[in-house]
């Protein structure tokens, strides 16, 4: 077990041209396992069910992850207490437990710990810059106490709020990454990806990119736009992408949360492990060196990324001991037609069927078009009432 501080830092690795592999999507994975509630998507499980969070960290580590992100997504006090969410633990307890779990597992391998903050109800409700930064600072105090290796501001729909987060995180002197949940159209205020990236780098981010909301190849395209703009501005940064594990060709600016299938019927859109290998290769070719995943990414997806880039990294992940590359393990199958699939060209050419003959291949995004400052996005501590839900149901029914 490597002691804290003895490992090479994330910037040292990236500056050397190495690939850093992130982890996957904790809130979706743990919701499916029964440890996170869909709706608030908050990370109480770090304190309530540490064994579940620890095991998922461990599976991502075995799959090839170099970074264990603390399970602190939506762990700001204002989000933890939003819309009637009831807590058995304080925000500080949840953040501390998440840091301890990430460090415990990171020390089982050559992995770093990243403390993460994300967008806040305070910003959506038009609170001041000072108030929003104070919210980030409360989480940051825990990350400093627990001596995380790097900091990530992730899942921001508005570059302005992400800038505020980066400014707070940068004051620590630790490496800072910043990822927006945007596609090629830019943030929810219409700021294009390139401008977003330049602003984040000027705010102090060492690593910039995107996470969530869109599929891998869309995210690679978006980060390529960021990279071009940063270089044109004469600035320097490293680049990262942690996309969805879902196909989103029909998504608009809001991404997958605008799809009618969100969040309980997305399974037909899941990428195969072979498509993840394509993602890893395209990201690498685009000059992206921090490559991970977000919602929908399971450990086998991360293993596919690590296997695709094994030549560049110089090794295979531990979990590949139980996985034949490009299906080669199928040589051992009892059925001859399955043994015939033990080859790369079979899986690369396959176009998987959904088995749903009455379902469309594309959806129409809801397209409500609301963002910061809209009455429907003003947040509250009290539970959502039936009176508040009724007009939302009516508006949704009118669209479908």
Swiss-Prot record:
<dbReference type="GO" id="GO:0047150">
    <property type="term" value="F:betaine-homocysteine S-methyltransferase activity"/>
</dbReference>
<feature type="domain" description="Hcy-binding">
    <location>
        <begin position="8"/>
        <end position="309"/>
    </location>
</feature>
<dbReference type="InterPro" id="IPR051524">
    <property type="entry name" value="BHMT"/>
</dbReference>
<protein>
    <recommendedName>
        <fullName>Betaine--homocysteine S-methyltransferase 1</fullName>
        <ecNumber>2.1.1.5</ecNumber>
    </recommendedName>
</protein>
<comment type="function">
    <text>Involved in the regulation of homocysteine metabolism. Converts betaine and homocysteine to dimethylglycine and methionine, respectively. This reaction is also required for the irreversible oxidation of choline.</text>
</comment>
<keyword id="KW-0479">Metal-binding</keyword>
<feature type="binding site">
    <location>
        <position position="294"/>
    </location>
    <ligand>
        <name>Zn(2+)</name>
    </ligand>
</feature>
<dbReference type="InterPro" id="IPR017226">
    <property type="entry name" value="Betaine-hCys_S-MeTrfase_BHMT"/>
</dbReference>
<comment type="pathway">
    <text>Amino-acid biosynthesis; L-methionine biosynthesis via de novo pathway; L-methionine from L-homocysteine (BhmT route): step 1/1.</text>
</comment>
<keyword id="KW-0489">Methyltransferase</keyword>
<keyword id="KW-0808">Transferase</keyword>
<dbReference type="GO" id="GO:0006579">
    <property type="term" value="P:amino-acid betaine catabolic process"/>
</dbReference>
<keyword id="KW-0963">Cytoplasm</keyword>
<feature type="binding site">
    <location>
        <position position="295"/>
    </location>
    <ligand>
        <name>Zn(2+)</name>
    </ligand>
</feature>
<comment type="subunit">
    <text>Homotetramer.</text>
</comment>
<feature type="binding site">
    <location>
        <position position="212"/>
    </location>
    <ligand>
        <name>Zn(2+)</name>
    </ligand>
</feature>
<dbReference type="GO" id="GO:0008270">
    <property type="term" value="F:zinc ion binding"/>
</dbReference>
<dbReference type="Pfam" id="PF02574">
    <property type="entry name" value="S-methyl_trans"/>
</dbReference>
<dbReference type="GO" id="GO:0005829">
    <property type="term" value="C:cytosol"/>
</dbReference>
<dbReference type="GO" id="GO:0055123">
    <property type="term" value="P:digestive system development"/>
</dbReference>
<dbReference type="GO" id="GO:0071267">
    <property type="term" value="P:L-methionine salvage"/>
</dbReference>
<keyword id="KW-0862">Zinc</keyword>
<dbReference type="GO" id="GO:0003323">
    <property type="term" value="P:type B pancreatic cell development"/>
</dbReference>
<dbReference type="InterPro" id="IPR003726">
    <property type="entry name" value="HCY_dom"/>
</dbReference>
<dbReference type="InterPro" id="IPR036589">
    <property type="entry name" value="HCY_dom_sf"/>
</dbReference>
<dbReference type="GO" id="GO:0032259">
    <property type="term" value="P:methylation"/>
</dbReference>
<comment type="pathway">
    <text>Amine and polyamine degradation; betaine degradation; sarcosine from betaine: step 1/2.</text>
</comment>
